[in-house]
Amino acid sequence: MTVTMPNVLVTTDWVAQHATDAGVRVVEVDVDTTAFDQGHIPGAVGWNWTTQLCDTLVRDIVPVNKLEELLGSSGIDNKTTIVLYGDNNNWFAAWAFWQLKIYGHEDVRIMDGGRKKWVAEGRDLSTDAAAAQKKTYKAKTADTSLRAFLPEVQTAVAAKKAALVDVRSPDEFTGKILAPPGLPETCQRGGHIPGAKSIPWGKNCNDDGTFKSFDELKAMYAAQGITGEAPVIAYCRIGERSSLTWFVMKHLLGFDNVKNYDGSWTEWGNLVGAAVEKP
């Protein structure tokens, strides 16, 4: 394990003081793509995960040219401090964080507690569009060491040399349901990847949306045999919830070798010849 990096988290107080600083850009990324327009942190820009943080033609993360265009149009260059936040305890803020790290952005942080905490504290919200002077952004070569692909997951299952963490709900893990309530059922089969441990993503957070303490998180994962000594692969349904768990293990606990399998259950659950476990 490496030393943890608490500088990847900022408080709501910090954001209130620095949101409009030169060199800082606050970005909201929500599950509910209408939330930003209903009110957001003054000075923030909004990214739509369904159109701006994925390849809309090929199932994949955002292509590098689209990422560069998105960041540049958001007033972000390579030296900008990006502060991400969103609803649902920062589900898609973590998804954006993971992709930004893949493309090598150095200073990217998450506002602890997300939109939930900001609103609960009665802080200001704005419906005004943020003024963003267009900048030039140049992404680095994609760091695929942060991402697990199907062959690696298949090898991990066969060799049993990596820990698999299923971050979905218990009902998804057991196969009782195929997707969270209200979301499309995109899989043919229910269950989980053989050998995976069930550690639902929500257990990483307190009731106010903030992350649990280092000691609490370390104990929770250790109780399931996840200590960071062996490689870890996290997955969910499409990779967004598991990106939050990846963030916790990689940046809050300091695990050296942890990857997000964004193919997740929509890939594995539909794959011909792939084994599925059910209790």
Regions found by a protein language model. Name each.
Residues 1-34, 115-188, 276:
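Flexible, polar/low-complexity N-terminal or interdomain linker segments that lie immediately upstream
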Residues 256-279:
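Cysteine-dependent PTP/DSP-like catalytic domain, specifically the C-terminal lobe
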